[in-house]
């Protein structure tokens, strides 16, 4: 049965407007962006199939272009719609953080970093430079490594921070193929960078790790040296 023939309260767009986004499943949200399905599938059926195929909505959004385009029912137009939905979220978070409306909220910081780092096929290391009011001055990926490690130069991180006249910073990196549990090397880097920042009156306020399916904040979890 086509979605237009469903009861009004069950149609994704009408359901969204009447009850709010919290009442929609991932498949229903995705179906709104897909707009149409195929000859044999409704937009919701197609959305469910994609999420099942990739394992989660997050995995779908992080998948390489060629992998998504190889899926039945997904052409360039639908893929562009999926990318646009992700970019809308990124730009919203970016605007919030640049006006100081989000950096005091741990979840928004994690969401912002996650939208930028999840999907990177290799391990990368990024720095968020902030002013005293926690407005975002700059976000940049400074180092790119391999599939399971990334070399970081602490002196380069400090030079980068000073070049943006920042007083506070957050560091972040990803685990492309594992969960967000910090490794011994992650903990050592965090400690050494915190010590180096303290010497030049820079405040390192968090280290965020983006795993395959979750994001971890050192500060939120009171992990050393923030605990």
Curated annotation (Swiss-Prot):
GO molecular function, one term: metal ion binding
Motif (JAMM motif): 173-186
Keywords per UniProt: Hydrolase, Metal-binding, Metalloprotease, Protease, Zinc
Domain MPN: 102-224
A Gene Ontology biological process term: proteolysis
Pfam families: RadC, UPF0758_N
Family of the protein in this entry: Belongs to the UPF0758 family.
Record's protein name: UPF0758 protein Psyc_1834
